[in-house]
Amino acid sequence: MMENNNSAFSYNLTKLDLIDNSGKAWNLIPGVQAITYYESICDPYVSANIRILDSGESVINKIVGGEEVHMSVGGPDEVEYHYILMVYMVGDRSVSNKIQTYNIGLISAESLTNESMKISKSLTGRPDEIAKKILEDENIIKTEKDIFTTPCQNNTKIHPNGKSPFTVINSLCNGSLAAIKSNVKGSDSSETTTKDKSLGGSAGYVFFENRKGYHFKSIDSLCDVKGEFGGGGEIRTFIDSAEGGVNEDSIINVNFESEINLIHALRLGTYSSQLQTYDISSGKFEVYTYNLSKEWDNQSHLGSQTKLNPIQKKLSEQPTRILSTIVDHEKYYNGTDTADPDDP
């Protein structure tokens, strides 16, 4: 039987019911050996694993997959948290002396819907609006959970080609640019000549789910300690957790695999990089240059560093990574006449 209040955080499991296909609720608490709950900013779902020791009624015989599990947990802040997850897996089953143990895998209901849905229709607009539309559309995910987004300043058009909804949203993350503190501007000339432009702002979003709902947020907003990039302006550090006492936001362990590697950073173009594009329809060749020294103040930063040191400024002077790609503005134009390459 699971022992409640067995951790420093004093979490209480107050409810754990499995609803079978007939609608009957089965209390799983007496047989629970362990529960592991997972959230990650890299995953568009929450999941859990329950280890069951079953010596009485064989609950496993009632499970066929897709059942709801209602879970309530009392936290150290004296607030009760409620979760409704779906059974997607039963495994690691063993039987000995009329006692069987097994794992029940739980996941968000939307994740099961995601696996059964494919999107083929082209989607146009701001990435954050596209993500929200996919999640709310009654013909796609149709979630009733809250959705939190950081507004994007760029528009895009995506051709999913039968990809799953979550895959489509994840594909928008790298090319999404937050509207706050961005200096990217459209082209102001139709000349088919080389133009060197400064690429500003900080691209990069993450799509994930936690107990509050779905998030399509810019990395800058998540790292925002000053409230300048759409974030809350509050970051809880490991030191805060150690000195601030026990609560639901306490960080109990931190592992840094790699912190500083200048060679790796230079090869990735962390300090300065260049993007070269060639439009095969218009013949226009453009060059976009990213320089960390110029863009430092347009980004949010974690840690104690408030400015670049001399060597970092020097490493920002020349692009250390050059990327090139072929584009075709006609591909994203819906009209019947010739598209204007300078019309966003």
Predicted regions and their residues:
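Short alpha-helical segments in extracytoplasmic peptidoglycan/chitin-binding modules
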Residues: I134, L172, L323
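Stable alpha-helical elements in mature extracytoplasmic
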Residues: R126-A131, P165-I169
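An acidic/polar, Gly/Ser/Thr-rich interaction patch typically located in mid-to-C-terminal regions
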Residues: A34-K62, I239-P344
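PEST-like low-complexity, intrinsically disordered acidic/proline/serine-rich tracts
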Residues: K118-S120
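Short beta-strand-centered interaction patches in the first periplasmic/extracellular domains
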Residues: T101-I104, S108-E110, I147-S273, Y278-I280, ...
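N-terminal export/assembly leaders
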Residues: S47, N114, A131-P160
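Assembly/oligomerization scaffold segments
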Residues: M1-S116
